[in-house]
Design a protein with these regions (language model features):
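Conserved N-terminal segment of class I S-adenosyl-L-methionine
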Residues: 1-183, 193-196, 261-263, 282-313, ...
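Hydrophobic/aromatic residues located in beta-strands of well-ordered beta-sheets
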Residues: 130, 209-211
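Feature marks short, surface-exposed loop/turn motifs that line or immediately flank catalytic pockets
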Residues: 139, 217-219, 266-267
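Short N-terminal helix/helix-N-cap motif within the alpha/beta-hydrolase-1
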Residues: 190-194, 221
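A short glycine-rich, Lys/Arg-flanked "PGG" loop and its adjoining helix->strand segment in the class I
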Residues: 193-208
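Short, glycine-/aromatic-enriched active-site segment of Class I SAM-dependent methyltransferases
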Residues: 211-238, 243-248, 273-278
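Substrate-binding/catalytic lobe of Class I Rossmann-like enzymes that use SAM or dcSAM, i.e.
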Residues: 243-277
Length: 326
């Protein structure tokens, strides 16, 4: 790769990068490479091509269904599990989502997909006004239809707004929300710093920004070559470490309270399957709900504490919640 072909999406460096992985899952062109910037150590795809149409047409989930054989019903089931866990995480991290002026707290879930998190918030935190901002009308319609057909009071239809978090949206909603969430969104965009800054600009004073991403230092990378190969995929432009997430947040938000913790999404049986068979579980990967409680929680807690889990959670509480300092 010639140096003129590379530009780091975080620091702008153009020196020849270090090759991390030559093949990228789902790359039909064969031209994408996973590389590491030698100036700032960020790992990204090169060239960092963002395809909005992929998400508007629900191509990401379509690939999972077609490539791994995972039924859409399982995607929905796992999304519901993740949503409940994420709602619980506010209390775990000391976020009450209660305003001092007596008005309902407001939450915006950016890139909320089918709306499972928005639905869980509506059901479990009816005192909070929650909205899902989703760029794909197709996904919002699919989610709405799923909740309506399900007819389950535990899964109400969330409030959707179809659109992008662009400068126009920020101008209309600046300082309007008490919490903004991006669950596995940041890795998909070609300017993650700008997206973080726009998201923070929506926060009221005292508000908080919640970002979850896959973990570059997932320990399973070193235990299953197939898992490592699969984890570099064409829709994920960036691959973040805990250290990089913290550096990004401190660069954007001087004086902010910044917390980066590990979070384990998939269960121990999925972990063992990758190690033993060097392959995914396929149609029903283990998400772990209530079985194997002691074993699962002990293993999960250890990975999260070491930040070698499969995901990372960044929580930022900017000073004055005014957004970017750059």
């Amino acid at each position: 790769m010639a140096s003129e072909d590379f530009r780091c999406i975080l620091c702008g460096g153009t020196d020849r990068p270090h090759l991390v992985q030559e093949q990228v899952t789902g790359d039909a062109s064969g031209k994408l490479r996973a590389v590491q910037c030698l100036a700032c150590a960020h790992v990204q795809l090169s060239p960092p091509a963002y395809d909005l149409g992929l998400y508007q047409e629900d191509g990401q989930v379509g690939f999972v269904i077609g490539h791994y054989g995972t039924p859409i019903e399982t995607v929905f089931e796992h999304s519901a599990i993740e949503a409940r866990r994420r709602v619980a995480r506010f209390a775990e991290h000391g976020e009450a989502l209660v305003r001092s002026d007596g008005q309902p707290a407001r939450l915006l879930d950016i890139g909320g997909g089918y709306g499972f998190f928005g639905s869980a918030m509506t059901r479990l935190r009816p005192d909070v006004e929650s909205c899902v901002l989703e760029p794909s009308a197709s996904r919002a319609e699919t989610g709405t239809r799923h909740f309506e057909e399900r007819g389950d009071p535990d899964f109400p239809v969330p409030r959707f707004e179809v659109g992008l978090l662009d400068e126009d949206y920020v101008a209309r909603h600046r300082r309007s929300y008490d919490a903004v969430t991006l669950w596995h969104v940041l890795e998909h965009v070609d300017d993650p710093l700008a997206l973080m800054a726009r998201a923070a600009a929506l926060l009221r004073p005292g508000g908080s920004l919640w970002i979850e991403v896959p973990n570059l230092h997932d320990e399973l990378f070193g235990l299953s070559p197939a898992y490592r190969r699969r984890s570099y995929m064409h829709e994920h432009i960036s691959y973040f470490s805990a250290e990089m997430l913290e550096r990004m947040a401190r660069r954007l938000f001087a004086g902010a309270d910044v917390e980066v913790t590990g979070y384990q999404r998939y269960g121990i049986f999925n972990y063992f399957h990758w190690i033993e068979h060097n392959a995914p579980q396929g149609a029903r990967p283990d998400m772990w709900e209530r079985d194997r409680w002691w074993l699962e929680t002990s293993w999960r807690s250890a990975r999260e504490a070491a930040r070698t889990s499969d995901a990372l959670l960044l929580v930022v509480r900017p000073v004055g919640a005014q957004g970017s300092q750059t």
